């Protein structure tokens, strides 16, 4: 069986790793072994954080919706409950966008949600 020399392929592989490790600090951008190790970690972090990003955006949308809802005299969870009862299907991304960019439309949605809510049984009764 013929002997296979790997110098061309090995150098190409090392060059690709070092090229993708540009911008890393210290030896991690210059030495192949350290660069490869850091590159593997960075790919793992990128994979993990692409999935985590979705949850972070959802948290941001909920914070924005809650702040705008409280300006309309209703809490976030009551707003979502009212939207379900009123059968208004608007996702959190759109609600957050309305809260930031079109407050009048968001206020109208809040009023519709308030109207759909049942009377609060825990609210203090008005003196007769």
Swiss-Prot record:
Ribosomal protein listed as a keyword: yes
Q: Which cysteines are joined by disulfide bonds?
A: none
A Gene Ontology term for the protein's cellular component:
ribonucleoprotein complex
Where is the signal peptide, in residue numbers?
A: none
Give the highest taxon in the source lineage. Bacteria
- Which GO biological process annotations does it have? ribosomal large subunit assembly; translation
| Ribosomal protein found in the keyword field | yes
Task: Enumerate the GO terms in the molecular function aspect.
Answer: rRNA binding; structural constituent of ribosome
The UniProt entry, under Pfam families, shows: Ribosomal_L20 (PF00453)
The record's Gene3D superfamilies line, in alphabetical order, gives: 6.10.160.10, Ribosomal protein L20 (1.10.1900.20)
Keyword list, A-Z? Ribonucleoprotein, Ribosomal protein, RNA-binding, rRNA-binding
The UniProt entry's sequence similarity note says: Belongs to the bacterial ribosomal protein bL20 family.
* Function field: Binds directly to 23S ribosomal RNA and is necessary for the in vitro assembly process of the 50S ribosomal subunit. It is not involved in the protein synthesizing functions of that subunit.
Name of the protein:
Large ribosomal subunit protein bL20
**Species, as recorded:** Corynebacterium efficiens (strain DSM 44549 / YS-314 / AJ 12310 / JCM 11189 / NBRC 100395)
Which gene is transcribed and translated to give this protein? rplT
């Amino acid at each position: 069986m013929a002997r296979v020399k790997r110098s061309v392929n090995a150098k190409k592989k090392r060059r690709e790793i070092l090229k993708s490790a540009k911008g890393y600090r210290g030896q991690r951008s210059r030495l192949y072994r350290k660069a490869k190790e850091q590159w593997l970690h960075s790919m793992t972090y990128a994979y993990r954080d692409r999935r985590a990003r979705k949850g972070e955006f959802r948290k941001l949308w909920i914070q924005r919706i809650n702040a705008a809802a409280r300006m309309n005299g209703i809490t976030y969870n009551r707003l979502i409950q009212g939207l379900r009862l009123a059968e208004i299907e608007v996702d959190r991304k759109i609600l957050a966008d309305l809260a930031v960019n079109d407050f009048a439309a968001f206020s109208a949605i809040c009023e519709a949600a308030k109207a759909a809510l049942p009377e609060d049984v825990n609210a203090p009764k008005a003196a007769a």
